[in-house]
Every structure is written in structure tokens, then in C-alpha cells.
């Protein structure tokens, strides 16, 4: 056993045990079979009471809405996460902070986009993910250019380090906002990857494949979404994270791709990605590429729990819980809209 793992439990043993206990409460296939049989959201609430969610909706007045369920699911996850973060020592504390940065990026982009469409900031802030909240959020609406956004708001946040390649005097419009989102994510993933390799050991062995997949998924999606837009091939290539399995040859091929078939051809060279593209289709009843990516992400995150004495379980738990929230909200939406034909289109976890 490596020396560092010998002392792992001194600082982190309690929290690793705690996160494994939380993971044991993730809904099983039997729970989902019960949920999809519910006729109303009140039935859904009753079924969730028999799981680890318990009475988390007990204080909500009828009629229950999907947005309330969504908010409460996030709230429960955030309470668990913050409880662990507040008791963590370095370097686990920094690792857990890294987990929150992706939500901070999403929140900044949501606020800028909403402001661009003349939405009040007071209306937008409640829509932000609580795991990515930060003090300066409500001032985002004063920024007119990426440079202002950085200098006035983000310079004192952890996102400042990821923003160096985004600073320009161009006005914030739809295209620029998407470029900022993807540039921030590229810098974030590369920094997180570097941090995990620095930690080394089992954390690096289990986290790096997860982050490599996340980087490659973004490269595939950026390429597919860029078709038919004004984004040039050169600008598109600048948005690809360089910490995935596709780097460098696969990314060079994606940069030259002109249509979906050419993207699929790139995936052919990578066995795990080839399977994902082959299993996706656009016909009724087929799984979308996004669903296939989510399924693969769940699989990678579950693998993290097979090893002990490492930090990846904290990341994996948050991502599995996030997928569980998406599943419950999907089922709730289908029940609320009486659209049961697609109610089984959730991503099972265990």
C-alpha cells in the first residue's frame, strides 16, 4: 500500500465512509419501476418518501409542481455536498471546490444569456444551480463585454483563472456567450485534469478517465452543434479541451469535419466512442447520442466506487445524484403532462 494511502483515513476516512453511505441511498431499478406507475405528482411524493429522500417534500403545499420537486432535489444534494465540504481537509477541500466550478460556469452563462434577453436578474438568480452560487452573481447584468465581465465581477472568483482566453472588447451576443461557455469549460477541465494528475495515486487513476471522457464528449458536441452556424473551423478547434483521448489526432480530424457522418467516422477509431455512436439514432424509439453519453458517464462514475482511498468517489457521487435528479424530473414531467409514452426514457443507475 502506498504511503499516502496508509494515512488516507486520518483526514478523509470519515468522509469517504459518508459518501459511500449516501451512494447506497441512490434509487434502484425497483424504485424507478414504482415511480413510473404513479398517476399524479402526489403519488410520486409518497413513493419517494419510502426511499432515502424521506419527507423532503413534506412542507410543500398542494398542488405540487415539477419545478418545486426539481428545486428540492437540488437542495437535498447541495446540503449533503456542503456538509462534506465543510468537514474536508486539503487537498480534498480543493478537489471538492473544483466540482463546484462547472456549476459556477453554468450560472454565469445563464445570467448573461438572461440579461441579453432583457430578463430581470431577480428572476434569473433563483434559476441558478445552488452548488455554483457565488457572492458576485447578481452583478453579472452590468457587464456589456467579456472584459467588463472579468474585470468587474469574475476577477475575485475562482473562475478568474479560466477566463484568460475569453477577455475581449466584443459585445456579448449569443455566439460570443457560447464561445465563452466552451472556452471556460476547456480551461476548467484542463485545470481539473492537471490537479488530479498532481494528486496521483488512485485518485488520478480513477478521475482521469472520467475527465478524459468529459473532454471528448464536449469536443463531439461542440463539433455537431457548430454545423450550420457562423463558427469557423479554426474557432471551433480552439474550443476543444486537450485532456481527452481524442487529443491530438482525433481533435484535428474533428476540426476538419463538415457533417455528422464525418464526426461518426472520427469516433470509429476509438472503440468506446464507436459503440456510443452506433447505439444512437434519430428514429422514434432510438436513444439519442446525448442519452448514450449520459449512460457512459454513469458507467464511469459507478466504476469509481470499486476502489478505496481516493477522492473520485465525491465527484462520482455528485454526478450520479445529478443524473438521478434528471431522471426524477423527467418522470415527474411525463406524469404532470400526461405524456406517458416516453416515461421510461430515463437513465437507470443501479
Curated annotation (Swiss-Prot):
One Pfam family from the record: vATP-synt_AC39
A GO BP entry: retina development in camera-type eye
GO molecular function list: proton-transporting ATPase activity, rotational mechanism
Gene3D superfamilies attached to this UniProt entry: ATP synthase (C/AC39) subunit, domain 3, V-type ATP synthase subunit C domain
Xref: InterPro entries: ATPase_csu/dsu_sf, ATPase_V0-cplx_csu/dsu, ATPase_V0-cplx_dsu, V-type_ATPase_csu/dsu, V-type_ATPase_csu/dsu_dom_3
GO cellular component, one term: proton-transporting V-type ATPase, V0 domain
Function: Subunit of the V0 complex of vacuolar(H+)-ATPase (V-ATPase), a multisubunit enzyme composed of a peripheral complex (V1) that hydrolyzes ATP and a membrane integral complex (V0) that translocates protons. V-ATPase is responsible for acidifying and maintaining the pH of intracellular compartments and in some cell types, is targeted to the plasma membrane, where it is responsible for acidifying the extracellular environment. May play a role in coupling of proton transport and ATP hydrolysis.
Family statement drawn from the similarity comment of this UniProt entry: Belongs to the V-ATPase V0D/AC39 subunit family.
Protein name (Swiss-Prot/TrEMBL): V-type proton ATPase subunit d 1
Organism field: Danio rerio (Zebrafish)
Organism taxonomic ancestry: Eukaryota, Metazoa, Chordata, Craniata, Vertebrata
Gene: atp6v0d1
